[in-house]
Design a protein with these regions (language model features):
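A generic "alpha-helical surface" signal
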Residues: 36-40, 86, 112
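Active-site-proximal flexible loops/turns
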Residues: 27, 60, 79, 91, ...
Length: 175
């Protein structure tokens, strides 16, 4: 559409690449399941598209034994929060002394950006919920915090629910 409007010399199509990363289970931040490998794969993404199971099927086992979309979404979110909290706390412990003494300006800037993130994560809130200055956002980009990435939830419903997804109680709970 834009190429037709502006007639550029070259048209580069937009690309949205999805990578299916299996393996995040409760305890992943402590190395369970694919654990750290899984988390490292997510760090490389620009956004997270979380597909949440909202259908019943006895032929497809659920890792927790039952379908509960809210529980499953919260499990993933908590694992991402735990992983980020570990990253942030490790970094704070390395720079805190220099930052508080005021001898290192960069350490102070980093500390001032990380401290509110740590507080939010400790309360179970994602890093993206913290208001930061433009400078702080640039500074934190290097940490590749998982909960700072945009999150899109996709309800995986049965084919029978496609025409009227509101009949699916898990979908309704998730939306």
């Amino acid at each position: 559409v834009l190429s037709g409007m502006y007639n550029p010399k070259k048209t580069t199509p937009a690309v949205c690449e999805f990578t299916d990363i299996d393996g995040l289970v409760k305890g992943a931040s402590k190395g369970e399941g694919l654990g750290n490998q899984f988390l490292a794969n997510i760090r490389e993404t620009d956004a997270i598209c979380h597909v949440v199971r909202c259908f019943e099927n006895s032929d497809i086992l659920h890792v927790d034994g039952s379908v509960d979309a809210i529980r499953d979404a919260e499990t993933i979110n908590l694992e991402l929060i735990f992983a980020d909290l570990e990253t942030v706390e490790n970094r704070i412990s390395k720079i805190e002394k220099k930052a508080i003494q005021g001898k290192d300006k960069d350490a102070k800037l980093e500390y001032d950006a990380l401290k509110p993130i740590q507080e939010a994560l400790s309360k179970g809130l994602p890093a993206r919920s913290v208001e930061l200055t433009k400078e702080q956002k640039v500074l934190l980009k290097n940490f590749q915090l998982l909960t700072n990435k945009p999150m899109i939830y996709v309800a995986n419903i049965s084919e029978g629910d496609i025409t009227n997804p509101d009949n699916n109680k898990e979908y309704v709970r998730l939306k």
